Amino acid sequence: MSAMSSNWNRRSVLRAAMGLAATGGLAACGSNTGRGGGAGSGVNLVQYFHAYGEAGTEQAIKKYAAAYDKAKVTTQWITGTNFESKLFSALLTDNAPDVFEFHPQIQLVKSGQVADLTDLIEPVKDDFNQADIASHTIDGKIWGVRMIDDPQFFYYRKSMLEDAGIEPPTTLDELVEAAVKLTTDKVKGVFLGNSVTPVMNPLIWSTGANTLDDKNQIAYHTDDVAAGLKKLRTMFKEGHLLLDAPADWWDPSAITQGLVAIQWCGMWAMPVIQKALGDDVGIFPFPTSADGGKPAVTNGGWSMFVNAKSKHLDEAKEYVKWLWIDQKEYQEDWSLSYGFHIPPRTSLAESADKLKSGLAAEGVKLFNEYGNFDNPAWTQAMIVALEGVIADSVRKGGDPEAALDKADKTVNRELKKLFG
């Protein structure tokens, strides 16, 4: 694996917390907690970040922290693919981070693990993407500050589609047909990730359904979703999907190295893909899968939270306010200088020249028109349950209805825990 692939492979693309009862040795995070010694005002803060794949990200985060003069801020840059287990193990110890990045999760709030940040965000709330505000609002309070928005969609090789005489698919049926025509003895048609699970939610959204409804009840178990799973199975069974790629879907190397014609990936990879392929690349959303449905984009991203149990709670909140509310220059740098991410601050997104033209502008358009944001009630156990649906029905060829029934039991059990 190349150095670039190794960097991208460390990107742990997480969608939810594992729960605060997570176990595991904190030693895996490294013995240096940053609590002792060093210069500064006498207050030591520790922040946790997962290891981003984009070059320069670690140096940037540490540069921002070094510029803060009211406390000494130490960064724990967590490598590996189990950032969430290391983070939540650490949160149960005396060496827990004061500040950490993650995704909005209702368990964090119900357990009292994260601090209410409403007072920080309220004065600038109107300058944030309102969907981000909504996804971080639980019980009328705002619990995290969004740092970056990361839309996910399909990249495709224009030349390969042109040679096959096809247009970018607008329906799931067309994607299945395209996979057939694009597959050769050297190139596979489509890459949906080694597990195929990254497109489970987009499939649901593209039928017009959702994971949960407004009453926090199951909304994904529909005939159209079951039919869509059968179509994914067709691509898998017929050998038109790239499987067991050296690097998974968040790494753009499958398409940049010519292993596949169409790849599901994120906007963060756009500069790398364009550098490798030039103008021979386009993008499109997950295509419509049913009558009444519409194309779908996953609007992922990362947010900053404050540990409510921090010994330096006020200082931690002040640092988060300074960096992720006040320092718009750093926020823009973080979003646009290391891969492409959409700034959650509306004023920054609208003024970002790098996002105003070409493929980046198309990505922003897909984000705005077809994006689906985090649902904080959708827990890790629920995510795993739907990953099981893909495993059982797409990879193993089982009955989609039976697979969905199996998932329903887990999801309903989780919903009962959360909402009674």
PLM regions with names:
Residues 98, 125-160, 188-189, 293-296, ...:
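A structural signal for short loop-to-beta-strand junctions that line the ligand-binding cleft
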Residues 118-130, 209-227, 274-276, 285-297, ...:
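Short, solvent-exposed loop/beta-turn-alpha elements that line the ligand-binding surface or hinge
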